[in-house]
């Protein structure tokens, strides 16, 4: 859906503007938060009273009676003109108060109900929306250890949010006056830029709850190594060490291709209710947006469908769970063709080792072309796309890198998977220059060098410790040196 910005009034073309920087909260922010909290508690008390009264209409009538504003019917045939006039005045007062009480009842209802989540989002408030459910939903939820959350109010309480705040975070607008995310770009190896979209603190805290209590409890395939406890770029690389052929395939637009509807489907299959799945899928996704000025107002305009943001804590875990079937199919394909398969986020790696093949296959060449053709078929069938420019085939005798580590067969004392030599040489040269009092490269800091040393330590602890010790010594020397006046 494309939003329409008042076409009846001529205006200048929208101008793209940078996302504004966050400003520090004002001194009375705490007082405003407390006032909002008290107002919300009052709404919850009112909502409870309405439920106990039997509904909004019964509560309104009871309030009118308690205030002495409920007016009984009048027999106009026997009433005097004076009584008629007085009765009409009372009815006006009753009607005015009834409208005010109905507004109050609606405010209380909004504090405990979602109601609407924006254009293109189906939302059913009642709990009967699961009448046509996925098979064995309750059993799936129990098997995955998922908490049964049967209402928006229960979910909001678990997240530490009010229902109105939950609705605000989940509500989808094509054009919005505010955004729950902060975006910036970082350079990629090929010179292009990657956009990072990170949620603001309160939404990030809610997403972390979703990650811990929902996403991380969903099943993940053993071939997945990224963002999985106990696995890393090292475990991913070690699966391919000493191979004769390494094939790397990259998935294009990995996070943006996972829309909120795909996330909802994943959560439904995991055992969550319809409403809970809808709210959590919207809470974990956002549309890519561009900030524009329109008639003096800053607007955030959606440029595409709502999908996983690269920068949200939930995104990697959701893709791991969503790729369960993809990983199963690619693992089976790899096994049939004699390959080993692993996945680290959007990086798919296959390796073929002659020594691991059955004797009849050892004289055959690895079926790389067949593998690549069928990988593309499986990837597309599972809703993803292969990046046409990032497929690499590295044979024995050329440098084979997997998730940044070299996995070629190495000497007796060398790690099976190791940091490339040029990185080690770069760190060694940087330390040498600093010891000689020479300035580092532009933008180079001790913290960055320590990060490189820690990277080396992961694959070669002895070498990494030696580099870290030298950097610690340099840091101590720098802090002890007299500061120039």
From Swiss-Prot:
<keyword id="KW-0460">Magnesium</keyword>
<feature type="binding site">
    <location>
        <position position="347"/>
    </location>
    <ligand>
        <name>Mg(2+)</name>
    </ligand>
</feature>
<feature type="binding site">
    <location>
        <position position="346"/>
    </location>
    <ligand>
        <name>Mg(2+)</name>
    </ligand>
</feature>
<comment type="similarity">
    <text>Belongs to the bacterial reverse transcriptase family.</text>
</comment>
<keyword id="KW-0814">Transposable element</keyword>
<dbReference type="GO" id="GO:0046872">
    <property type="term" value="F:metal ion binding"/>
</dbReference>
<dbReference type="InterPro" id="IPR000477">
    <property type="entry name" value="RT_dom"/>
</dbReference>
<feature type="domain" description="Reverse transcriptase">
    <location>
        <begin position="167"/>
        <end position="407"/>
    </location>
</feature>
<keyword id="KW-0808">Transferase</keyword>
<dbReference type="InterPro" id="IPR051083">
    <property type="entry name" value="GrpII_Intron_Splice-Mob/Def"/>
</dbReference>
<keyword id="KW-0548">Nucleotidyltransferase</keyword>
<dbReference type="InterPro" id="IPR043502">
    <property type="entry name" value="DNA/RNA_pol_sf"/>
</dbReference>
<keyword id="KW-0695">RNA-directed DNA polymerase</keyword>
<feature type="binding site">
    <location>
        <position position="250"/>
    </location>
    <ligand>
        <name>Mg(2+)</name>
    </ligand>
</feature>
<dbReference type="InterPro" id="IPR000123">
    <property type="entry name" value="Reverse_transcriptase_msDNA"/>
</dbReference>
<protein>
    <recommendedName>
        <fullName>Retron Mx162 reverse transcriptase</fullName>
        <ecNumber>2.7.7.49</ecNumber>
    </recommendedName>
</protein>
<comment type="function">
    <text>Reverse transcriptase (RT) responsible for synthesis of msDNA-Mx162 (a branched molecule with RNA linked by a 2',5'-phosphodiester bond to ssDNA). The retron transcript serves as primer (from a conserved internal G residue) and template for the reaction, and codes for the RT. The retron is involved in antiviral defense.</text>
</comment>
<keyword id="KW-0051">Antiviral defense</keyword>
<dbReference type="GO" id="GO:0003723">
    <property type="term" value="F:RNA binding"/>
</dbReference>
<feature type="region of interest" description="Disordered">
    <location>
        <begin position="1"/>
        <end position="33"/>
    </location>
</feature>
<dbReference type="GO" id="GO:0003964">
    <property type="term" value="F:RNA-directed DNA polymerase activity"/>
</dbReference>
<keyword id="KW-0479">Metal-binding</keyword>
<dbReference type="GO" id="GO:0051607">
    <property type="term" value="P:defense response to virus"/>
</dbReference>
<dbReference type="Pfam" id="PF00078">
    <property type="entry name" value="RVT_1"/>
</dbReference>
């Amino acid at each position: 859906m494309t939003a329409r910005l008042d076409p009846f009034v001529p205006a200048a073309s929208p101008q793209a503007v940078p996302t504004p920087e966050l400003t520090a909260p004002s001194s009375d922010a705490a007082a405003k938060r407390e006032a909002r909290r008290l107002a919300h508690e009052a709404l919850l008390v009112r909502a409870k009273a309405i439920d106990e009264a039997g509904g909004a209409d019964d509560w309104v009538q009871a309030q009118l009676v308690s205030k002495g504003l409920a007016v009984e019917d009048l027999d106009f045939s026997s009433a005097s003109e004076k009584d008629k006039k007085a009765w009409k005045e009372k009815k006006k007062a009753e009607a005015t108060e009834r409208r005010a009480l109905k507004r109050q009842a609606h405010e209380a209802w909004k504090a405990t109900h979602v109601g609407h989540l924006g254009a293109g989002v189906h939302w059913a408030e009642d709990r009967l929306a699961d009448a046509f459910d996925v098979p064995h939903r309750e059993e799936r939820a129990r098997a995955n250890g998922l908490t049964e959350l049967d209402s928006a109010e229960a979910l909001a309480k678990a997240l530490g949010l009010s229902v109105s705040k939950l609705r605000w975070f989940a509500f989808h607008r094509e054009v919005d006056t505010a955004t729950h995310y902060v975006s910036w770009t970082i350079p990629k190896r090929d010179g292009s830029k990657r956009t990072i979209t990170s949620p603001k603190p309160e939404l990030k805290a809610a997403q972390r709850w979703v990650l811990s209590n929902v996403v991380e409890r969903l099943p993940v395939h053993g071939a997945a190594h990224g963002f999985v406890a106990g696995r890393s770029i090292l475990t991913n690389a070690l699966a391919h060490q000493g191979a004769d052929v390494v094939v790397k395939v990259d998935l294009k637009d990995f996070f943006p291709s996972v829309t909120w509807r795909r996330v909802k489907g994943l959560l439904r299959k995991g055992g969550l209710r319809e409403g809970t799945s809808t709210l959590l899928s919207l809470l974990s996704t956002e549309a890519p947006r561009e900030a524009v000025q329109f008639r003096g107002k800053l607007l955030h305009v959606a440029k595409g469908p709502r999908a996983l943001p690269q920068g949200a804590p939930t995104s990697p875990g959701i893709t791991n769970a969503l790729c369960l079937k993809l990983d199963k199919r690619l693992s089976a394909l790899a096994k049939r063709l004699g390959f080993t398969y692993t996945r680290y986020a959007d990086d798919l790696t296959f390796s073929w080792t002659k020594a691991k093949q059955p004797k009849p296959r050892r004289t055959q060449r690895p079926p790389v072309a067949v593998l690549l053709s069928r990988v593309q078929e499986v990837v597309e069938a599972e809703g993803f796309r292969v990046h046409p420019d990032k497929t690499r085939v590295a044979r024995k005798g050329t440098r084979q890198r997997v998730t940044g580590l070299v996995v070629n067969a190495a000497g007796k004392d060398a790690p099976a998977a190791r940091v490339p030599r040029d990185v080690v040489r770069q760190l060694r040269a940087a330390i040498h220059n600093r010891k000689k009092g020479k300035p580092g490269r532009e933008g180079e800091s001790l913290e960055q060098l320590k990060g490189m040393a820690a990277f080396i330590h992961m694959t070669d602890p002895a070498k990494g410790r030696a580099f870290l010790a030298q950097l610690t010594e340099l840091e101590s020397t720098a802090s002890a040196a007299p500061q120039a006046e």
